[in-house]
């Protein structure tokens, strides 16, 4: 609707829910092949098709604020990397879309790093799943539409999903009575900035006049922040409703738990970065940003494995 209004009807978009044309995990190939024009989804879903997607949305213990990601995309070369990544698959990357941090909904209490071991938990795959597997979790990859029934039937013990407002409306508090979060310093361990994006088939993109291409990119940027702030407001009420209306307990891990998870991160960052040259380019760019005075999360001495041995890029 926003695009239609902004273009005075010269460019209109007809949207379909996931599964209406193809399944969630088939969208990438369908748009690449021109089965339909575009999709709106999470970049983290496509790491198996394009390893650089690992670094197009947040991953454990890296950039963890929306403004940091926006800066990387718009000022530090991230947009060009994303467009090259999707361009290799006949798609044009319109821009990042801010969403929310992700929660873990659990049927059982998980109060420490040690209590994750042996649990069967849905994660989106890639580097995120790898870090939890290193901690002893049995990870499961499921499309979003299959998460609720899997939790309800006890097929999995817990699941990552999106933020509080969306999850409350989906009824997660009716079947999983625990929300697992990090401490205030690290509210979300695995996807603190769960970015989405819009990809359009390259042939479809080239048919759009230049001024409408620019309008479409501007509309995506506007939608990104409108969506983000609306979700943050809705989350405030949702957390209250989870606890007061559905009897959900919010468990916060300790900083000491975070440090135990964190030791798995650097070697896995580098393993995923080395899967292809573009992934490495993205990670190197973010690693330099992470070491700046402005961010200051790491120094070069922190790029070591669990035994303290230096890792080379």
Regions flagged by a language model, labelled:
Residues 1-69, 77-313:
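N-terminal secretory/targeting leader peptides
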